[in-house]
């Protein structure tokens, strides 16, 4: 008979009528888990950013007994030796949990099996096949999980868990062992065991890369972004000059829109938006006296001896760098000042 054991320093928000569970201690959990060669592991977190958010629930157990630990009041430090040891720990999408466990507790989980990764290998990562835990429980066990509860851990703060949340946490690990057994039979039959081992090691390597992040020099980046923006503006002016020099009058307005702050000599005399492929195509067709369908680098390279084309290709290169790796790139810099 399945048993759910909650470990917390505060009582749950409601009774166990929705999901029967018992109360236990972290020592009892360690005693039971330390005897197991294979366990399922999962976490519930405040959010998706391991540099900002915390683990609020840690689940570990077997198909028969699942321990649901309220990590806001109970530390999983007593489980360190087991998690870093040789027993098999089954996760679903281990990269996510691995980074949170390492960030919150400086524990590096070893000897991992990832049910999501195994499923991707079995089905070549085909789109629309479905690789969520709910997809797997339905596919292999004909059991549906209510994943809507997952969002109820966000903004939980110090509130006690509901029995619904406790049950949800337990179910996330209850079926992992059965799924692994089914997957491994097929993996072995197909001769994919070595591939699974390689992919698992690679997944953890990438998890460490994401965890460590890339150091980022914000000041130098912004200086370089300003330089690139300046080069883009310079090339835009040179492109405008090519329009006036070649007297492409259809792209030169009959009048200038004056304002109080811009000198007349600085007003644009060309009404082409150089970042617009549609407008640039009209310019190139008029300038080259041909009918281009596209104005990408491949199509224009054959006309690179033409000054306007040369300037435009230079502009596109710098404009791409400026838009992709300019000031907007700062949105990828995380709280700790690193890029992930």
Q: Which residues does each predicted region cover?
A:
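Active-site-proximal helix-loop-helix substrate-binding element of RNase H-like nuclease domains
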Residues: 2-20, 49, 53-188, 196-198, ...
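Short alpha-helical segments and helix-capping/turn motifs at coil-helix boundaries
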Residues: 24-27, 43-44, 74-78, 190
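Short acidic, Gly/Ser-rich segments with clustered Asp/Glu that frequently serve as metal-coordination loops
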Residues: 38-51
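Conserved "right-hand" nucleotidyltransferase catalytic core of DNA-directed polymerases
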Residues: 1-21, 179-340
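A short acidic-Thr-Gly-centered motif at the start of a beta-strand
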Residues: 23-37, 80-83
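Alpha-helix boundary/capping residues
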Residues: 33-36, 86, 105, 125, ...
